[in-house]
Amino acid sequence: MKKNTDSEMDQRLGYKFLVPDPKAGVFYRPLHFQYVSYSNFILHRLHEILTVKRPLLSFKNNTERIMIEISNVKVTPPDYSPIIASIKGKSYDALATFTVNIFKEVMTKEGISITKISSYEGKDSHLIKIPLLIGYGNKNPLDTAKYLVPNVIGGVFINKQSVEKVGINLVEKITTWPKFRVVKPNSFTFSFSSVSPPNVLPTRYRHYKISLDISQLEASNISSTKTFITVNIVLLSQYLSRVSLEFIRRSLSYDMPPEVVYLVNAIIDSAKRITESITDFNIDTYINDLVEAEHIKQKSQLTINEFKYEMLHNFLPHMNYTPDQLKGFYMISLLRKFLYCIYHTSRYPDRDSMVCHRILTYGKYFETLAHDELENYIGNIRNDIMNNHKNRGTYAVNIHVLTTPGLNHAFSSLLSGKFKKSDGSYRTHPHYSWMQNISIPRSVGFYPDQVKISKMFSVRKYHPSQYLYFCSSDVPERGPQVGLVSQLSVLSSITNILTSEYLDLEKKICEYIRSYYKDDISYFETGFPITIENALVASLNPNMICDFVTDFRRRKRMGFFGNLEVGITLVRDHMNEIRINIGAGRLVRPFLVVDNGELMMDVCPELESRLDDMTFSDIQKEFPHVIEMVDIEQFTFSNVCESVQKFRMMSKDERKQYDLCDFPAEFRDGYVASSLVGINHNSGPRAILGCAQAKQAISCLSSDIRNKIDNGIHLMYPERPIVISKALETSKIAANCFGQHVTIALMSYKGINQEDGIIIKKQFIQRGGLDIVTAKKHQVEIPLENFNNKERDRSNAYSKLESNGLVRLNAFLESGDAIARNISSRTLEDDFARDNQISFDVSEKYTDMYKSRVERVQVELTDKVKVRVLTMKERRPILGDKFTTRTSQKGTVAYIADETELPYDENGITPDVIINSTSIFSRKTISMLIEVILTAAYSAKPYNNKGENRPVCFPSSNETSIDTYMQFAKQCYEHSNPKLSDEELSDKIFCEKILYDPETDKPYASKVFFGPIYYLRLRHLTQDKATVRCRGKKTKLIRQANEGRKRGGGIKFGEMERDCLIAHGAANTITEVLKDSEEDYQDVYVCENCGDIAAQIKGINTCLRCSKLNLSPLLTKIDTTHVSKVFLTQMNARGVKVKLDFERRPPSFYKPLDKVDLKPSFLV
């Protein structure tokens, strides 16, 4: 196949982003943003949050203050590696320590005198234990000198049970665009949040709502609960900006449709009516009166001046150091969007759009928790000082309060899946698929309670804003997470930025904006507002917007601002705004740059010749105008061409309309979808099902399972796939393997492999084909006295235990064997008994159906004995186990056939697996056939012309025609055997072979599709799911089999099962199942008068209803099932009377039988 052509340049550039980039510090691209996020927290942000100096209490008009100072923050890495942590059964944590000083400041004439109250130098080894993120190669951000393990990609935490934890990224609730809502007809709200910049600690949040009712325009107010006054939005804008109402009218009306202009005039007129209704109206007096009224309403302890300063100074925290005039112009720009959105709602980003949201990564989780717990810690110290002063008259702090910051509990809860009282942020890694290490940390989800609480959310639909940045295939197909969790595409990442970098970047952008002529950036009446993270900094001349944005983008790409991930969005469509985004949590990905109708990739002739020796960062430095990092907001408001091929087919005038061009379709998939093959050649649902099944595939070891007491299922003899995509290779999924190559035949086999049934060869299983090992953790807690008790009677359950009460190493556990000794004893109060001690076994038993070998035993002795046992079991495929291809052709083992029973080809080769051929037609998985063809072609020519082994690149999504792959296969066969005839060549290309019947040794009439394919074994194993049993425990209430395979449960015999047996006429079987056992048999006395079940009072059966009416009941004994009696009792308790009536039949009389003469016929 021809390589390095112009048409493949975009593909090669995309591949450069996927591979490691050591010059930029990128060693593993899929999880690099998570590593950076956590590294920023542990190295920088934690120091910023914990370093505090602020007043706790103030007295005597601030002349006396109790101060707290936290300093000397130090973070120490662990002395051991993650593997040692697993061996010891410990967590992998960093230790954070700090010094707390509490002192009293008194302002005197001589100056400020300081009196020490309390101090604590935190050197405790358990003060703050921060779970440490394990990065690529077992490295951590605190100690980069740790040794590398190439196949360990990390991205996990290890908790105190040495269990790996990974988490998804949650969509932040706060939106960067105001949320528009229709409350009722002609009534609307526009709510927005304002959050202080990252350099302002503690972080301040304010939430505001603008309300507008067409019938009451005078009440077009802005409000915020307890943090701001309720005031007319137009008058507030006038008060802050110090402009006239006519100025605001012209600003709101500029470049607006006529219907919006009409509404603008009505709102301004309504504001005028307010001013005219007040004699000698003064805007300052009007606002001051409202502030005073709010002061009285809240019963604030502050003076009126302090209250006013606090309210107005903290108005819009994200513009904390901005003059009030710019805040007023910002409010005018918000009102402008609001009025436009009323008439053109569909053109405004809705609240479900990813344009409006930032994303919480690992570092942000810990940052938020550290911030919240620090405020709780300081609050506890303040309360303790106040209580001590009230009770003892001294300013003192209990040492217990100083030594319990509370962060450990918060971090522990985070790793247990609880973040801000919402589930779903973290979960235990299941270990049955190596891809989970990548897919879970790269998934983005909404808060579950966001959807439950808000009825307006429609996040369950695939939102248009997710296009290109999220994988459209790797989404949950069923369950509560449908539409709530999405997987990032391979080119997507999430931005991170340090506080110092944020401030420097903001300063450079402001300097660049102010380098323009002053009048051109002061068009506050009719210009385009320029905002940096929603903070208004200027308003640009409308005639300069295109030149400004173009020049800004060029300077950004050239590194003028020192950050290549800055987002600049030109919002047109009458909303008129230039938005510059520099914060963390934004979705970004690279795009090819189009400048003045030219694809910049095409105007760089040196790029193609130098590309092989360059990294992605080299391309950004030496060819800065070829690729641009674009965030999702900039992408949404830009014109983007979907492919280079389509762009080149356009006319020159059409090309000038575009700003960016996308990479090929394979880069729109996520890493899990990239493990599939040719999903665009299959039907749509196969891609979604294929992603779900690929994540359920059992892969090779992701960690040292013998030293880690954790659950896991691992493939014993994995093979690297031959047909792969570039993303599969660079993410190391291919190198870590998740299947084996098997030889398949598409045919029917004696009618056994119907539907999803597959036939698997016995000798293939015996040779270790798709063999797995199951590691299972068994954990029990035993009271110390129970563990020390000795058994009085020998128990078979304790046959595998040592004398120390623990299970023996290398013992084979069977169902019913005890894990550890647990004997409960009780003393009988019987003076005549010789031995009044009784004991009984309450140990937890091994419950699996298969035997397992004890690999490791771990014991912790505290007030209880904590025993953790790791068992291992090799498990070969059996009937009922599930397998699949990478095209979602799932099959279940229906029959294990001996090699002598299977058809064979001319070389005597028999298929390892036989699959029903009709499944290809019904599921339309053409790419499965292509994979077999390419794998077979590789076997004919596994090396390229340089003698190097080369896998076959078959991306998950591609624009390559099937004929191209057929031509590739043809060249491979012609190279290895040029003397093939056309028919033989065609048979080899299309993998068609003549197979011979094993019974007659005659060839089949038609050729069979026969060839190798990469096959996966799924975690759905028969022995893990079987719950059928003959005897066992029953529930007390309904006396049916209890639930849960681990608890020895079975399948309940309910209505549907009963109906099935009735259909078969198996009356005796129903009676036997429901009645005949001793537990289910129930004698019931029924009153023939009223049909009630009789009650037993003091051993006498009586009908309560008839006895109250002084009637003489006639009770009849019937036998029924216990569950029937429970049902009747429950119905009666709910007020539903079920009457048991007896069938009244008249007596039957039969005529005498005819006499039968038994004499021999010859005597008659």
UniProtKB/Swiss-Prot annotation:
The lineage of its organism: Viruses, Varidnaviria, Bamfordvirae, Nucleocytoviricota, Pokkesviricetes. GO terms for molecular function: DNA binding; DNA-directed RNA polymerase activity; metal ion binding; ribonucleoside binding. This is DNA-directed RNA polymerase 132 kDa polypeptide. InterPro entries: DNA-dir_RNA_pol_su2, DNA-dir_RNAP_su2_dom, DNA-dir_RNAP_su2_hyb_sf, RNA_pol_132_poxvirus, RNA_pol_bsu_CS, RNA_pol_Rpb2_3, RNA_pol_Rpb2_5, RNA_pol_Rpb2_7. The DNA-dependent RNA polymerase used for intermediate and late genes expression consists of eight subunits (147) kDa, (133) kDa, (35) kDa, (30) kDa, (22) kDa, (19) kDa, (18) kDa and (7) kDa totalling more than 500 kDa in mass. The same holoenzyme, with the addition of the transcription-specificity factor RAP94, is used for early gene expression. Belongs to the RNA polymerase beta chain family. It is an enzyme of class 2 (transferase). Part of the DNA-dependent RNA polymerase which catalyzes the transcription of viral DNA into RNA using the four ribonucleoside triphosphates as substrates. Responsible for the transcription of early, intermediate and late genes. DNA-dependent RNA polymerase associates with the early transcription factor (ETF), itself composed of D6 and A7, thereby allowing the early genes transcription. Late transcription, and probably also intermediate transcription, require newly synthesized RNA polymerase. One of its GO terms (cellular component) is virion component. Its main location: virion.
